[in-house]
Amino acid sequence: LIAWLIWSEVCFVLFYVPLSWAVDYLPGWLISATWQLTIIFGVLTTPLVKVTRPNGQKQALKIPLASLPWMLVILLGVLLTVAAFLYHLQHITPMLLAIGAIMFGAVAYPLGNRKIMAVVEPSMTATEKVLAMLLCSYPVWLLIAGLSYHQVGLPHMGQVINTFVVALSSGVIATVLFFKATQLAHNMRELAAVEATQSMEVVFSVLLSLMFLGHALPTPSQLLGLTLMVGGIIMLAIRE
């Protein structure tokens, strides 16, 4: 129970709170781009996952050395995208803090997920896993809600509707499907392929930001960084 309480907070609370704070300072597509670092951190936390061999013994997965070059390509893409965005800004301190918050969440999410995978019962479904983690983290969410009410009062109806849509699409549908896919992965390549699907988040974020939020098209340098990042993630997933 203690492990469930601790790692549920790490996976959910320490993931959503930093990202929610970063939204006030960075455009959505840049948050999605920086968030792709979670794929690198996910690979680095792979040894925390243990799989059951045919002989019944549990063995920790290993970090494949073949993934390191593509991880560097992903990192280069993220750095180029972020640097191109910050280049024309005069006050970059809040932006750097927001990027740091995203990186913190990018570590917390795969770390919490890996540690929960180590203690979850094989018979537990992805939906049951998400529900259990939500219940374990709920006291902290109530505390955060209480502090927010004390400082700014009740949210507007528009905020409630937007939060409901995000919670349903990202917090329920996407999380359950993602956790189900990670449970089906039996080796590092399959696990990396599952996590690589998150790269499409960048493409959708750019397109939807242009369509609905009126954001400017990323600069050529930023587009190059995004291309390197998505390409590195895809190659990481399909490597031999």
Stretches found by the model and what they are:
Residues 9, 13, 17, 39-44, ...:
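Hydrophobic/small/kink-forming positions within alpha-helical transmembrane segments
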Residues 14-23, 76-90, 137-152, 202-218:
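Hydrophobic alpha-helical transmembrane segments in multi-pass integral membrane proteins
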Residues 43-47, 62-85, 220-240:
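Hydrophobic transmembrane alpha-helices of multi-pass small-molecule transport proteins
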